[in-house]
Amino acid sequence: DVYKRQTSGSGAQDRIRITQRLLPAVPLGVQQATLVQLPPGTPDTVDATALPAYTQAVALPAGALPGRGGLKITLQPRLAQGLSGVRDWFENYPYTCLEQQASRAIGLGDAALWSRVVETMPTYLDEDGLANYFPPRSGDAARGSDTLTAYLLAASDQAATTDPAFALPPELRTRMQNGLLRFVEGRLERRFWSPRPDLEVRKLAALEALSRGGQVTARLLGSLSADPNRWPTSAVVDWLSILRRVTDAPLRERHLQEAGQVLRSRLSVQGTRLVFSTESTDEWWWLMAGGDTNAARLLLAVMDDPAWREDLPRLVTGLIGRQQRNGAWRTTTANLWGSLALQDFGRRFESVPVDGTTQA
């Protein structure tokens, strides 16, 4: 409050008052969270005390500020409610390279848009069957991307498990698969700038895409170092998926166990957000890989693995917790893999309608 008055003459005066709102120095935040599936009751149960119950012991965290915070309990029939934020994000997305077009069509579940993308896709392939982000000009050297080709094959295959309309036409798919196969075998070379050596990680992504079509044999795995501790999380997820599909892989059970242990050791749930301990080194953006896509693809990779069954709800809520404030993830690839993962989870575990009442 500032006051000023003229001491001579007319004695004019003025006053300025500024109101400032003081907010707590420590904002509220989720310190710990849990997710449970409530046991169902029987329709004819009259006595509420006889119904199945869930109890959870709680206590104030050490050093909690008096009078701040509390418990928040929410109930919902599905963990992913419509993904409206992702749909809005895709509907307003303005860019149009091949990856972005494909991600948008599949992410929106728009079969007509996907059909138009597929119609033009052959013009994006080089002479070896590998896809470019933009159509190459006549006379250009073959510069198709093994990374983009693997992504298109894997994403369309995953989407087709729910809606066959998103499968690639057989002739186009075979042409792309053959290009990837030659790349994995070393008969086809692609050199691109990268901030670190990435050939083995690129081969793992290609093998994961090829394994979906049953084209990976034990012989093709022989050139890999099979050292997941050295790999980024995206490569470990690829390795786990490959091993689950290639049943005659050498030392398969040992490698499966090792890959699972590496992934579990990197997992951490902070409040309601899933993070990896290697997050700072997992952003392989030039290969379209990062924390968001890793979380989504891990969920897909372990969806039907009994050893991960108890972890699935935590993986789902942790994946959702990685969304930005607009209810979407940061990139086209993350939004596509995230939506595919949550749709697959809902189809497998949330297909039965929920009704009745719950008391808390």
PLM feature spans:
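Long, domain-scale non-catalytic interaction/scaffolding regions in large secretory-pathway
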Residues: D1-T7, G11-D14, P52-A53, A59-G63, ...
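Extended, solvent-exposed functional surface patches
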Residues: D1-P197, K203-E208, A218-G222, W285-L287
